[in-house]
């Protein structure tokens, strides 16, 4: 399955949600699965982004649906990047 990097920045509402219910992060990951994608790994980060997630989805349409659904909630802003395995990238050159 294609791999995507999902970079997340919490809004003030999202910060309050995570502070009051840290387990909400795992709940959202399960919701991502219900939308057809899988969170394979996830980190909390310092700096511009609050979270970096490695997500697998069957196609860009599914990933777009995930990004739109999560973004529409107003608790975080998302930047999603398709990731090409380095061997595939080298072979394409």
Regions found by a protein language model. Name each.
Residues 1-34, 38, 45-49, 84, ...:
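Short S/T/G/P-rich N-terminal loop/turn motif that feeds into the first structured element of a domain
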Residues 39-42, 78-80:
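Generic structural signal for residues in well-ordered beta-strands
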Residues 57-84:
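An amphipathic, aromatic/His-enriched active-site/gating alpha helix that lines ligand/cofactor pockets
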């Amino acid at each position: 399955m294609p791999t995507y990097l999902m970079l997340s920045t919490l809004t003030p509402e999202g910060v309050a949600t995570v502070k009051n219910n840290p387990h909400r992060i795992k709940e959202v990951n399960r919701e991502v699965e219900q939308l057809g994608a899988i969170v394979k790994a996830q980190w909390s980060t310092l700096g511009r982004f609050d979270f970096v997630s490695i997500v697998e989805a069957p196609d860009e349409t599914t990933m777009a649906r995930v990004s739109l659904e999560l973004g529409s909630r107003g608790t975080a802003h998302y930047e999603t990047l398709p990731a090409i395995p380095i061997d595939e990238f080298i072979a394409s050159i």
